[in-house]
Amino acid sequence: MTVSFVHLRLHTEFSLVDGLVRVKPLAKAVAGLGMPAVAVTDQSNMCSLVKFYKTAMGAGIKPICGADIWLASREEDGPLSRLSLLAMNAKGYRNLTELISRGWSEGQRNGEIIIERDWVKEAAEGLIALSAAKEGEIGHALLDGEEAKAEALLREWMEVFPERFYVEVQRTSRVNDEEHLHAAVALASRCNAPLVATNDVRFIKQEDFEAHETRVCIGEGRTLDDPRRPRTYSDQQYLKSPAEMAELFSDLPEALENTVEIAKRCNIEVQLGKYFLPDFPTPNGMGIDDYLRHASFEGLEERLEVLLPKDTPDYEAKRQVYVDRLNFELDIIIQMGFPGYFLIVMDFIKWAKNNGVPVGPGRGSGAGSLVAYVLKITDLDPLAYDLLFERFLNPERISMPDFDVDFCMEGRDRVIDYVADAYGRNAVSQIITFGTMAAKAVVRDVARVQGKSYGLADRLSKMIPFEVGMTLDKAYEQEEMLRDFLKSDEEAAEIWEMALKLEGITRGTGKHAGGVVIAPTKLTDFSPIACDEEGGGLVTQFDKDDVEAAGLVKFDFLGLRTLTIIKWAMEIINREQAKKGLEPVNIDFIPLDDKPTYSLLQKAETTAVFQLESRGMKELIKKLKPDCLEDLIALVALFRPGPLQSGMVDDFINRKHGRAELSYPHPDYQYAGLEPVLKPTYGIILYQEQVMQIAQVMAGYTLGGADMLRRAMGKKKPEEMAKQRGGFIEGCKNNGIDADLAGNIFDLVEKFAGYGFNKSHSAAYGLVSYQTAWLKTHFPAPFMAAVLTADMQNTDKVVTLIEECRHMKLRIVAPDVNNSEFRFTVDDDGRIVYGLGAIKGVGEGPVEAITECRAEGGPFNTLFDFCDRVDLKRINKRTLEALIRAGALDRLGPHYHDELKAYQATVDLNRAVLLAAMEEAIQAAEQTARSHDSGHMDLFGGVFAEPEADVYANHRKVKELTLKERLKGEKDTLGLYLTGHPIDEYEGEVRRFARQRIVELKPARDTQTVAGLIVNLRVMKNKKGDKMGFVTLDDRSGRIEASLFSEAFAAAQSLLQTDALVVVEGEVSQDDFSGGLRLRAKRVMSLEEARTGLAESLRMKLHADLLKGDRLRWLGELFNRHRGSCPITLDYTSADAKALLQFGESWRVDPADDLIQALRDQFGRDNVFLNYR
């Protein structure tokens, strides 16, 4: 039977919001229905084109490439209409690409991509157009009863697309389908225009309709049962078979036949798999190959001046090693046709370095290239660390080289901008990414559109483990609680069922973290482009894999935060060096064998050190005790699940410290020739490069062939491995190596190849880790100031880093509008000055306003002076309050003294006055500004005019803040306590039942009691599945980790919250691993609970005068509200009597904080306290 239908209108998941068709299932479904071709016409984009083309061709289906577009209305405020375009040939494909790209760059309005009809006319060649049925402008006219207008429009489009314009009809059970169809058929007949039938496909199977509706509602932010929601789609818009379409259009067979005719007319070949590099301009007409050689040997001489002074023993022989390696690499690069690639990367890195943008020493396998090193693309000598070029560029496996380049976060966009200027702004773009509906999010989204409760969605979502790559199926398999919940809750099961259908569907677009493409001509010759509404933020519509398949070469411009930290630290250091008349420090020339740096590393004091700051890494460092850069390089490779779980890590450490025999590679089967290869890792096969070198040394492989072997081992295909094993043993035999030994070593290599790490990457990043450790060792304050600045928006991280500063004995100065900058800085006394940008609610704009005023008019004197001088349009009341509560205006208050003790004694009154005066200061400043603008006299003029005037006179009697209020203000604005500690308020009291501070604890078998603030809490499960907790306590003297095993944890769980003050009873012991102490908790109490159990009485010292009037009644009511078991005693004095009174049992109270504070507020702090046994 002849196929009588091809689908020509279809939206995939890349028609964001209104398509549910996935590309791979589409090709399979089309083939299954016996159709020879299918079109994809995504709305206003061609994002799926390469995926669709490759998948369809692979399934033996002819791909027809097209797009649906929104056409601008002829009237100013008229409705948009659709038009569907299909590419007939290469010219049509190019025109469609240009048209879609132009829509993005010039036609964005109100969130839609709108195409002007003149643009369509200019791009019509090579395109077939379908009228888009009732959604097209002809359809609009027909349904409005304007037949003459519809005819005029049709004739106009038939002129634009001669013999290539089709009147489209649909029967999808949607409103007006039939009315449009009958009118369209009559119109087509009058104008002698061909008809075409489509099913406007949105999903593959009919049962997917509900999932599609859900997806649309998620995109539109509506619920499924919203009565105002337009019902745009029907359950008939699925991928119908030719038979179903034949039955549906039995009265219009020509409309079906025309789909096949159109499919025959559309013949495009998308060129994939061929690379196109932009031309690199060479000087003096030199050929690109010659110029690469010239630049490389010039760079080698520069590098050798530092690496290999001419008085080095065996200078010529050592130099020749570099020359030979360089010639070898250059021959391969030139043979493979990649000189231009290297020169382009060299060029933009050179520009970055010359323009103050720090560049990383290397990343990935590119660090293995000597050519890259001499061209200053990388900064690590590959010969010194046995890094292999073939790991980067293998002549036996043709693929593009791929340099990942790290730039300082601040300067990365400047480098991209330079490249755009150098190669043409229409030739340079970043790359699109597609966000998908991930497990946790899709559950919440589905619940929302189904109208389910937030609580149910939250509960269900939280049952899905928070793990990279987590899927709904995986979560269901892993979590018994989730399975039970879904079985017991019908609504949850309904959410889950729908979420499974939508999981993984494309949800939105983004920008690739680092990918940049540089085209040899304009970008649209290779990929359609997208951008933001202003025409900026250019991205290719093809993702990174598709854009490379289309022929564009991807360059990775990655932002590495650590480079920014190093840059900021160096700026602070070299400013100080200049003040002292010292030479600037150059991070690229620091010694790599610095003993103090390795001492810091061996103690695992690696908080803020790149790659080495996690808890697990610190534990590994303490065991390994690195003493050279090779050890640091190994650390990064060792700290991964494979090596950690295989026993390789312990073996490595034991061999390093002489606790296990060094063998190359195994005690039972050794080959002496492997010692040079494996010596840096104590005989352990740790790196992919070592796998390659073993194959070279033992079996005579070329390094290119060895790289192929390494890749084969990574894939673990049994047939391939058997073949490789035979080749390896044969090669060994040819080198006189016993077959059994060769087989055993091959098996060992195969086992470890799965764990092998790219040494080039590890070495380059190991160097950055060393640089940060060196800075922390030798310039701790500038380094920590830079790290704090980098993390200032992450409050949790700032808290950790401030604690680290305290541990390092670094002094920290509170934020201060007269001294602080936006960033953290270091003052002349070596103290870290808190950055204003780290105060919550104070952004870059307000800080700029403050620093500009300070630069113009000097330090601020009072709050009133501050408000008068800064621009209050940039600093609002909320910002001002945050500055006061953070302590940044302390020096502007009435009670500030330079002597720290005096300052601390009055800080609570100071901040209370500032908060009270804030409103008046703002009003005074605003009035002054208005008066100044109008030329009138200022009612508040006296506040600012007289230097000696007491501007705080109206507010001096304000009640001072309590310690708790002051510290809460700091916690709210800074995320931490800066001028005190919550335990300070209870210091005298807690010493009665926790007699030792944390710093004074010693290991003992007796139960000891500790009071402290919970600053960190980790919860995990033991082997039985019971929860256990690890709580870090801080009492300002020190910290200790308390472990709570299942029973103790269950009993205390409600008390275990960050920032809670608790009392812990337990056994203190030595932690041999960390070298510190640990506490095994037996019991955890709140402060109130400890008071109740240990306090003898609540005691008050009161004079008769204090008990006059309503105070007795107030006291009775207060005690009534706090009934408990603690006795009350009263030291009573009057003019003629003195007595110690014991209140009766009916007046016992619960000695809670708010009771004690209320009594102290009323009678004075020193007159109310607890007596302990």
Curated annotation (Swiss-Prot):
It is found in: Cytoplasm. The keyword Cytoplasm applies. It holds the Pfam family DNA_pol_IIIA_C. GO terms for biological process: DNA replication. SMART domains: POLIIIAc. One of its GO terms (cellular component) is cytoplasm. The keyword Transcription regulation does not apply. One of its GO terms (molecular function) is DNA-directed DNA polymerase activity. It catalyses: DNA(n) + a 2'-deoxyribonucleoside 5'-triphosphate = DNA(n+1) + diphosphate. Its EC number is 2.7.7.7. InterPro entries: DNA_pol3_alpha_NTPase_dom, DNA_pol3_alpha_thumb_dom, DNA_pol3_finger, DNA_pol_IIIA_C, DnaE2/DnaE/PolC, DNAPol_HHH, NA-bd_OB-fold, NA-bd_OB_tRNA. Signal peptide: none annotated. Keywords: Cytoplasm, DNA replication, DNA-directed DNA polymerase, Nucleotidyltransferase, Transferase. DNA polymerase III contains a core (composed of alpha, epsilon and theta chains) that associates with a tau subunit. This core dimerizes to form the PolIII' complex. PolIII' associates with the gamma complex (composed of gamma, delta, delta', psi and chi chains) and with the beta chain to form the complete DNA polymerase III complex. DNA polymerase III is a complex, multichain enzyme responsible for most of the replicative synthesis in bacteria. This DNA polymerase also exhibits 3' to 5' exonuclease activity. The alpha chain is the DNA polymerase. Belongs to the DNA polymerase type-C family. DnaE subfamily. This is DNA polymerase III subunit alpha. It comes from Pseudomonas aeruginosa (strain ATCC 15692 / DSM 22644 / CIP 104116 / JCM 14847 / LMG 12228 / 1C / PRS 101 / PAO1). The lineage of its organism: Bacteria, Pseudomonadati, Pseudomonadota, Gammaproteobacteria, Pseudomonadales.
